[in-house]
Amino acid sequence: MTKRLELVWPNKDKVLLGLDENGKPIWGSKADLEPRLLVQLEAVGQTNPDNLDDLYEQGDNLLIKGDNLLALKALERHFAGKIKCIYIDPPFNTGNAFEHYDDGLEHTIWLSMMKARLEILRNLLSIDGMLAIHIDHHEYGYLKVLVDEVMGRQNYIDTLCLKVRHEDRILKGDKFTHGVIEYVLLYARVRDSFVIQKRTNETDLTKYCYEVRIASEGRIEDIGGRLVTVFRPDEYEIIKGEPSTDKLQMVNIRGSIKEGNSSGRFYEKYLVPRVKKDGYATLYKVRDIGADGLGFRYFIAPKDKRYRNGQYFQGIPIERQSAKEVPFANFLDITEANNRVQEEGGVSFRNAKKTEKLLKVIIELVSTSSDDWVLDSFLGSGTTAAVAHKLGRKWIGIELGEHAETLCLPRLKRVVSGEDQTGISKQVGWEGGGGFRYCVLGESLYLRKVLNGEIKYE
């Protein structure tokens, strides 16, 4: 008998078909998962000529309302081996009930729910495709072992660590720790066939748009063993212009940056205590610090007493100036984007909405072609579909709840019309176009045959 490392739990090899009226699980087998036809409710924008008998073969973007397990089973027949990028954001199983999802499933039921879906998702991936699973710390450990089993541990790529909120934003004071990190597990369908897309320097060039103009000689002091020129607020000007390689990036000195690099530590140790002496909005030109080859770095004290943090300005690091491509970092700070996420798409999805910035990063890790398919079977408010559409990719989104109609449908209509200028729209120059089909899963073909007398019980 072959031995292997695996998770074991009750009903592992069964399929959770749903919950009864008392909230107890209804278990079945894979054979109980019957493929369904799609029934179109609405065609939005530009779609291919109608062939309503088989919407799976149309090649149009699909927004599907219905149980995602049944929908995935239906897609498997037509899309096996065709999906380039799959992103899912399943319920985190935190026990925190919120409006749009049952986020408190019993632990083993949650694992069974995930296993059945992961097995089909694996079959849908193209040989060079990637699966991305968004999760927090509650189920991360168990999920990692489960996905290793389903996808193959050798196909694990990395875990993308997301900073989703600032550590100084305390949500609940009675917790042992303040959670600011979430995770995205990344798996290839076949690791040897997978090519991750590296980033070019131009990706971050938009941040380098600041220029510091000095109007006087300032005064020179020795601060912390470094030569520092100090300027009053009326002796300098910060100009924001078009991004270029000779401009500077402004960095807010907050959170981990305070202790995470030499600039943050210097500011906290030597410049913060000088605010009372030098005054607010003082500019410091500190010599011999930074890795951008300039030989100095500008620091600014907080503007006034209403502000807690200062800033520093840096150029493009030397090691990146000559590099045409750089590997993706497995850490992404999306705190600023999360602060604006409720504005995105014109729909509200509190506590569960994901930012378009994140989905753009994930899709572009693996997808480069307009022929690539992107799938999200826990579509939520429609972010994955919206981003895939704006990036010119083909997409399929599945959502069970009523918000398929109240959130996803109106959001994606605004994307098609070009009305949606939130999220990544301005970054990618989105003006509208394309289209999709809004569908529901049809009735059980087996049940219909029984009712029509085509199948009879003896």
Predicted regions located by residue number:
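Conserved S-adenosyl-L-methionine
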Residues: L7-W9, H107-L111, Y140, T355-Q427
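Active-site-adjacent helix-turn-beta-strand microarchitecture at beta-sheet edges
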Residues: T2, T177, V190-G345, E356
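DnaQ-like (DEDDh/DEDDy) 3′-5′ exonuclease domain used for proofreading
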Residues: M1-C85, T94-T108, M113-A116, D292-R297
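Conserved Class I SAM-dependent methyltransferase catalytic core
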Residues: H107-C161
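Class I S-adenosyl-L-methionine
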Residues: I157-V190, L441
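Conserved phosphoryl-transfer catalytic core
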Residues: H403-K449, E454-Y457
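Glycine-rich adenosyl-nucleotide cofactor-binding module
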Residues: L52-A74, E336-L375
